[in-house]
């Protein structure tokens, strides 16, 4: 049984493909250090504005830590790394959020950086924190936020084309196929790209922390501790995860360490 008219599908696919090709050709940029070509439909200013809004929303529902020494450490380490990014135009901000159950940190477009107190026992010292912030600021340097928005826009074009082609079919069939298309886009396109971005942020993070005067070997040690902390956490398999597994990260870091050490100058 035919689910949708072949001619209609081909027509929509041709239009969608042509539009996507034009967008990609006009919106390619190169990631610093890695040299990877990436799709960037939105401007850096637009991306930064999104980061500012998200940062404000997060802080509005969070409690900042009262630990002055730890907060100063976050600012000190973050500032050293930010100074070597080549982005003085960003309005860099650093916050330590009080949440001992959250072993996490993030950096948003425009230079908005936050660390949760729950990750400090794992980072242990400034070098460990530099490994975390180098990774998070690596996302900012590589403009991964804008890239993910751009990728989602292309995925939406593809899904809309497929749904338009299915519109003449049985409603129940259309709904079932639409669900499969959405799942396929998530597993087959968005998550793999996210894992690639996470790995790239690891790569960039090593270089950034080294340029800031932190020994990049601390990143390997950090992920060994992170692997121990995550055992028994019930995390999803790597195939369905937006982050590479800790063993994969450690192996990749070992490969990148010689390159990062070329940038390392102890302070």
Cite the ranges covered by each PLM segment.
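A Zn2+-metalloprotease active-site environment signal
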Residues: 3, 12-16, 23, 28-267
